[in-house]
Amino acid sequence: IRFLGSQAGEFPYVRGTRSHNRWRVHQTVEVKCPREANAEALKLLNSGVDSLGFSIAKEGFTAEELDQLLAGISIPAIEMVFCGAQTGSIAELVIAKLEKEGTASEAHVAFSIDPLVKGLSQKGDFCSPNGEKCFAKIASLIEKTREYKHIRIVTVSAGIFSNAGSTIVEELAFALSAGNDYIARLTDAGVDAELAARKLRFSFSVTSNYFLEIAKFRAARMLWA
């Protein structure tokens, strides 16, 4: 096999963005009762998990409930991903909490805000006409977290395409197209293109087609770089 000419952690990141091989162990917690979800999260952390996902279905989630959910969790020590019904509002609560506690610059946090794939592709519409309100809010969140390099605001949920029957190549193509559309829409909303790219992440599916899935991830890194 011909040498790619780059090491792991080097452009175009075919072998990954990290030079080490320390993978995180991720588990998602369904949040119905914040206290119960917190107990489950602490149990998972004590069992070796170091990346937590919180799926919050409840609308009107409050700052007090967020404090209950994250009680006893050392936020800088782990990675967190928030998804659910009103992720934009939850993002505002989380960012405010991190800034209040002085941990925003250390925190590794991502939000599954995805009006293009979860909204337009899956449901046929945005949260507002033409999506202007959606992208204005995303632009605002990006500006708030401009200096926090480990906080990602937008997640391209590529797994939705796979679950709808797309091939590996189609999933990759649709995901990159959505990523490009995000950059275009966010720059139209006044966000610098480089900053918009830093605040975006991709979430792909993994099927049993082992070698092609590995090739998909490698291709995704190279093409997006």
Residue ranges and their predicted role:
Residues 1-209, 213:
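Catalytic alpha/beta active-site cores
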Residues 213-225:
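Extended amphipathic alpha-helical segments enriched in small hydrophobics
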